[in-house]
Each structure stands twice: as C-alpha cells, then as structure tokens.
Regions:
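Bacterial N-terminal signal peptides that target proteins for export
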Residues: 1-12
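C-terminal motif of bacterial Sec signal peptides marking the signal peptidase cleavage site
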Residues: 18-21
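Bacterial signal peptide processing site
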Residues: 23-26
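Short, hydrophobic/aromatic-rich segments at coil-to-beta transitions
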Residues: 32-38, 63-66, 120-129
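Secretory pathway targeting signatures of secreted, lumenal, and periplasmic proteins
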Residues: 42-97
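Surface-exposed amphipathic alpha-helical segments
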Residues: 52, 158-186
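Extracytoplasmic/secreted envelope proteins and their assembly/folding machinery
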Residues: 95-96, 100, 146, 173-180
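Signature of long, low-cysteine stretches enriched in small and polar/charged residues
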Residues: 97-151
Length: 186
C-alpha cells in the first residue's frame, strides 16, 4: 500500500510540476491576424492592420526603431511606433513612468495597468488622449486622439515602448486588441 501511495504522490508531483510551466506567464506565442504587416525590431515585434504602411528609417522619427502609419485624405490618422532603449529602467514600472513622461503636454492620462505580452515577464499599458496639434501631417488641430503605450523590458533588459495613436473613430477597439495580442517580446 505504501508503494502505491508513493507512486501516486510521485505522479501527482510530476503533473503539478508540468502544469506549473503552463498558464499565462506572457511567454506564449503572439497572435498575428491574417493579412496584417509586422514591425520587427531586435527587442519586440508588433503587427498592424491592413491600411497601414511601414515607414522606412528615413521616414520615421530618429528615436523610433520601427513605425507604421495610416493616412486618410493625405493626413496621418493613426501611427504605431516602437522605441527601444528610450530610458534606463530596471522594471516595467520604471519603463512605464518614463513612457508616461513622454506623452504630449496637456494629454489626459487615464492610468496604467498590467498587460500580458508574449515573451515578457511583465509589461504595462498606459491609456491616454489628447487634442491633435494639426502639425506634421497629423489629424486636423483639435481632433481627439486616443493613445496606448505598451512598455516593459525585453530579454536583454532593454526598455521598449510600443505606442499606438489614432484619431478617435479611426481604429476599432477590436483592432487595437489584436495589435496588443500580436506583440512579441524577445
């Protein structure tokens, strides 16, 4: 009888150890919808919906490792950017504080929360909104813009920030969710 209990205990322990590796630790594979493009960088990848165009190094801002833009009527209505090493941070919380500091003056920050990103031990999401300035080919002055920043540390402990800005009504919530689900940190 003791041998049976020992075997049962060993089997249960083995199962428990195997299951410990399962679950949502952020290490699962990212989900990329069919037909979407992907911004690939050395620290993080993120996909974008049809209708966006990836910018070359010459077109995007010098601090952006990658960017994709959606235009309507000759104006940018949505931009997705990836920044790497934008700050020295030892945690996702520190990276989020630095990312928040980079949001446009006068923006309404609605807070930050934990978010699961494939490959990340921890990550933060910051939601905010602001009125467009009308500059740099963006939405007309005063247009409400919704923004989200996803931030954390990649596998080499380099801070990353993925920023999605979209004029209100130009990026469906379902597509924003798919963008977030597509993120893969490496």
């Amino acid at each position: 009888m003791n041998t049976r209990r020992a075997r049962l205990a060993a089997a249960l322990l083995t199962t428990a150890v195997a299951l410990t590796g399962c679950g949502s630790s952020g290490s699962g594979a990212a989900e990329v919808p069919d037909g979407w493009g992907t911004l690939r960088t050395k620290g993080v990848d993120v996909s974008y919906p049809k209708g966006y165009a990836q910018q070359s190094a010459a077109e995007r801002g010098k601090h952006n490792a990658a960017a994709a833009v959606r235009t309507e009527g000759g104006r940018k209505v949505s931009v997705i950017t990836v920044q790497l090493g934008f700050t020295e941070a030892a945690s996702a919380e520190q990276a989020a504080i630095a990312a928040e500091a980079g949001i446009q003056l006068g923006a309404k920050v609605r807070g930050q929360k934990d978010v699961e990103l494939a490959g990340a031990d921890e990550a933060k999401r910051i939601d905010f909104s602001f009125a467009a300035t009308g500059e740099d080919g963006g939405p007309a002055k005063g247009t409400p813009v919704e923004g989200v920043i996803l931030t954390g540390l990649d596998s080499s402990d380099t801070a990353f920030a993925i920023r999605v800005d979209a004029a209100r009504g130009t990026l469906p919530e379902a597509d924003l969710d798919r963008i977030i689900d597509s993120v893969e940190v490496h």
